[in-house]
């Protein structure tokens, strides 16, 4: 494994921790600031929207510097945002800190995906992307449970200071292990934007929004759901998050392994099963053992979609993939924001803490429908397939997916 992939995974670990740890600390944050749980949920949706906005903007700005330098600048921004969150005296300032940190998220994973894919042979690209995202999934096994435990025992502010420390480690890893590379020449912004004329790119991003939104509809409010519905103690949430993280690690690795050879079948299975499991979660959430098993499955099925969705975007926009890759990361978080908002609506309407699971099931089923439409169009020749898209785009711009 190239050491540069390890550096990217380290950065992903820090980013993944700050993205997900807030879900285990919503009650503590809500209590300190005197806001409701749905209002505290804006810390999730605000972060997600920051990723959506920041992904294209930061990526475009990053075309002026080398990829390594841009990755380092993004980690610096991430550190600053988490320090602001940790020290924020008001809810508004904490939300601002979350947004500042989130601006680095999409561009880091977008640029990182292109770098990771270029480090290996073409038939191993999904595996390389999955290796980088392993840092994100491991954050849910180690970083998020540890951060939740620290937040519940010593205060949530300490958690965000620790996350800032993770950012420092990630910055050092990128500086040390990612090789210096010149700024890519010959690919202009119009070539990057042209990728969005490919309907398959847009369909893949739609799958990303809806599929990952299904996951977040359930897990955004996992703490009140498990404590008030399943009857778990507050301290048990840490271990439930470990199970969620283990599922994510397994799903990510499986998705990366099979996406290179069976991309669309992988999406069919993972999205279809995710919709079913989320619907069942409305029932299993009332039993501790069944809830724990279901949470693990949601993590696994949700993250099994990440490598194939990211690879599909890279394939369809292979001549100029940097912006499309980053925007697709934003699409993951647009799904997060949509799910957190819809989940808060159904909870606020009095349908209970299990109601977001129905929202998640509907979103995942909609993503499956888009996958069917995408594959059908591709087989009928109504839209360019991956190879044709690569040839067409490469005719106007040299490929960015190459060894660094």
What are these regions (language model features)?
Residues 97-135:
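Cytoplasmic helix-loop-helix junction between adjacent transmembrane helices
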Residues 316-353, 360:
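A late C-terminal transmembrane helix in Major Facilitator Superfamily
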Residues 164-184, 370-375:
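C-terminal membrane-cytosol helix-exit motif in multi-pass small-molecule transporters
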Residues 265-309:
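C-terminal transmembrane helical hairpin of 12-TM major facilitator-type secondary transporters
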Residues 34, 66, 87-93, 231, ...:
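Helix-breaking motifs and short loop linkers at transmembrane-helix boundaries and internal kinks
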Residues 55-67, 251-263, 347-348:
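Helix-to-loop junctions at the C-terminal end of transmembrane segments
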Residues 53-92:
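Conserved MFS/SLC helix-loop-helix module at the cytosolic interface between two early adjacent transmembrane helices
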Residues 6, 77-84, 92-101, 289-297:
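Paired small-residue
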């Amino acid at each position: 494994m190239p050491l540069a992939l390890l550096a990217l995974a380290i950065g992903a670990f820090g980013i993944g921790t700050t993205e997900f740890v807030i879900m285990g600390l919503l009650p503590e944050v809500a209590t300190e600031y005197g806001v409701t749980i749905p209002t505290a949920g804006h810390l999730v949706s605000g972060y997600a929207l920051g990723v959506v906005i920041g992904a294209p903007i930061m990526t475009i700005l990053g075309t002026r510097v080398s990829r390594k330098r841009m990755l380092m600048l993004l980690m610096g921004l991430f550190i600053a945002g988490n320090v602001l969150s940790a020290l924020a005296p008001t809810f508004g300032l904490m939300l601002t800190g979350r947004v500042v940190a989130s601006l680095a998220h999409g561009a880091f994973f977008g640029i990182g995906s292109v770098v990771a894919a270029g480090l290996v042979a073409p038939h191993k690209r999904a595996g390389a992307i999955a290796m980088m995202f392993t840092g994100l999934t491991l954050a849910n096994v180690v970083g998020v449970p540890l951060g939740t435990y620290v937040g519940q025992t010593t205060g949530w502010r300490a958690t965000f200071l620790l996350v800032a420390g993770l950012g420092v480690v990630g910055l050092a890893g990128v500086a040390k292990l990612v090789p210096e590379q010149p700024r890519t020449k010959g690919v202009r912004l119009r070539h990057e934007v042209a990728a969005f004329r490919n309907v398959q790119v847009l369909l893949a991003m739609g799958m990303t929004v809806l599929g990952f939104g299904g996951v977040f509809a359930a897990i955004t409010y996992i703490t009140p759901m498990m404590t008030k519905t399943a009857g778990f103690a507050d301290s048990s949430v840490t271990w439930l998050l470990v199970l969620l993280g283990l599922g994510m690690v397994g799903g990510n690795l499986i998705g990366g392994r099979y996406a290179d050879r069976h991309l669309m079948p992988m999406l069919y299975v993972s999205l279809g099963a995710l919709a079913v499991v989320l619907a069942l979660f409305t029932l299993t959430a009332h039993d501790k053992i069944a809830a724990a098993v279901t949470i693990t499955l949601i993590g696994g099925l949700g993250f099994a979609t990440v490598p194939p969705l990211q690879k599909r975007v890279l394939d369809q926009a292979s001549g100029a993939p940097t912006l499309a890759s980053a925007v697709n990361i934003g699409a993951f978080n647009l799904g997060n924001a949509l799910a957190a908002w819809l989940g808060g609506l159904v909870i606020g309407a009095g349908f209970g803490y299990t109601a977001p699971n129905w929202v998640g099931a509907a979103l995942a089923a909609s993503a499956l429908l888009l996958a069917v439409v995408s594959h059908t169009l591709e087989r009928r020749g109504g839209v360019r397939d991956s190879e044709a898209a690569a040839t067409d785009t490469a005719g106007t711009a040299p490929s960015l997916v190459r060894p660094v």
